[in-house]
From Swiss-Prot:
Main location as per UniProt: cytoplasm
Protein's name in the database: Urease accessory protein UreD 3
Similarity section: Belongs to the UreD family.
Species of provenance: Streptomyces griseus subsp. griseus (strain JCM 4626 / CBS 651.72 / NBRC 13350 / KCC S-0626 / ISP 5235)
Superkingdom of the source species: Bacteria
Keyword Zinc-finger: no
Pfam families membership: UreD
Protein location: Cytoplasm
Organism ancestry: Bacteria, Bacillati, Actinomycetota, Actinomycetes, Kitasatosporales
Subunit structure as annotated in this protein's UniProt entry: UreD, UreF and UreG form a complex that acts as a GTP-hydrolysis-dependent molecular chaperone, activating the urease apoprotein by helping to assemble the nickel containing metallocenter of UreC. The UreE protein probably delivers the nickel.
Residue ranges of coiled coil: none
GO CC annotation terms, alphabetical: cytoplasm
Function: Required for maturation of urease via the functional incorporation of the urease nickel metallocenter.
Keyword Nucleotide-binding: no
Swiss-Prot/TrEMBL keywords: Chaperone, Cytoplasm, Nickel insertion
Length: 257
C-alpha cells in the first residue's frame, strides 16, 4: 500500500531577535524535529525519516514558509533513499518541496543526499518563491545508485521565482527512460554523484559574480537575477559534498566581505 504524507512548517520572528516555529507538523515518514542552531537568530529544523520512503507509488511533500524577517535552517538526519517497493507495477513515487521566503527572511535549505536505488522511479519537484529582499541557500545532491548497483529512474525539477519573476527552471533526468545521452561525455561522463548549490542574495543584483570554473567538474554561473548557481559532478557522494561545501564557504565569505 502506498504512503501519502505532507510535512508542514512555518517560521516567524519571535519578537526577541530570534525565530519561532508556530507550525511544525510531520506526517508518516516525514518527522520534523526542532534542533539546536549555532546562530541565535535562526530556528533549525531537522527532517528525520520515520520509515523507509519513498517507495514506488508513494506521494510525499514538504511545505515550508519563512515569513518576513524570520531566519530558518532546515537539514536532515540522513540521506533519502528512493526504493522500488514490493509492487513491480506501482506508479512512480513523487516528492514535492514547496518553499516560500518573505521580505528580509533567510532560508538555508540543506537536506542530505537523495539516493536513487536500482528499480526505483522517483519524480522530485522543488518550487521556491522569494520576496525581493529574501535570501536563500539551497543545496541538492543526487546519488545515482547505491554502491555497486545501477541507478534507478530519477527526474528532478527545480523552479525558483524571485519577486514574481522566473529566476531558475531546471529539469534533470537520469536512468531508465531518461533521454539518451544523460550518462554521456556532455552530461555526467560516467560520474554517479551530481549536485547544485543555489545562493540568492539581494547584493548580487548590484555586484554579480563572474562565471568561472571551480575545478575540473564544477562551475559557478551567475543567474539573470540576484543569485548564483554552482553545479558539480563527482565519482561519489563524499567528493561531491566536499566540492559543494568548499563553494558554500567561499560564497558566504564573499557576502561577508
Amino acid at each position: 500500500m502506498s504512503v501519502r504524507a505532507t510535512a508542514r512548517l512555518r517560521a516567524e520572528p519571535d519578537g526577541r531577535d530570534g525565530t519561532a516555529l508556530p507550525v511544525l507538523a510531520g506526517e508518516g515518514p516525514l518527522a520534523l524535529r526542532r534542533t539546536r542552531s549555532p546562530q541565535a537568530a535562526y530556528a533549525r529544523v531537522t527532517v528525520v525519516g520515520a520509515m523507509s520512503a519513498p517507495l514506488n507509488g508513494d506521494r510525499l511533500a514538504v511545505e515550508a514558509e519563512v515569513t518576513d524577517g524570520a531566519h530558518l535552517t532546515v537539514d536532515a538526519a540522513a540521506a533519502t533513499v528512493a526504493l522500488p517497493g514490493p509492487r513491480p507495477d506501482a506508479d512512480p513515487s513523487t516528492y514535492g518541496v514547496d518553499l516560500t521566503v518573505g521580505e528580509g527572511a533567510v532560508l538555508h535549505w540543506l537536506p542530505e543526499q537523495l539516493v536513487s536505488a536500482h528499480g526505483s522511479d522517483l519524480r522530485m519537484t522543488t518550487r521556491v518563491r522569494l520576496a525581493p529582499t529574501a535570501r536563500l541557500l539551497l543545496r541538492e545532491e543526487q546519488i545515482l545508485g547505491r554502491h555497486g548497483e545501477p541507478t534507478g529512474a530519477l527526474t528532478t525539477r527545480l523552479t525558483v521565482h524571485h519577486a514574481g519573476r522566473p529566476l531558475l527552471d531546471q529539469q534533470l533526468a537520469y536512468g531508465p527512460g531518461a533521454p539518451g545521452g544523460w550518462d554521456g561525455p556532455a552530461v555526467l561522463a560516467g560520474h554517479r554523484a551530481v549536485g547544485q548549490l543555489l545562493l540568492a542574495d539581494p547584493s548580487f543584483g548590484d555586484a554579480p559574480l563572474p562565471a568561472r570554473l571551480l575545478g575540473p567538474t564544477a562551475a559557478l554561473t551567475p543567474l539573470a537575477g540576484p543569485a548564483v548557481l554552482v553545479t558539480a559532478v563527482a565519482a561519489d557522494a563524499r567528493l561531491l559534498r566536499g566540492m559543494l561545501d568548499e563553494a558554500m564557504r567561499e560564497l558566504l565569505d564573499t557576502l561577508k566581505a
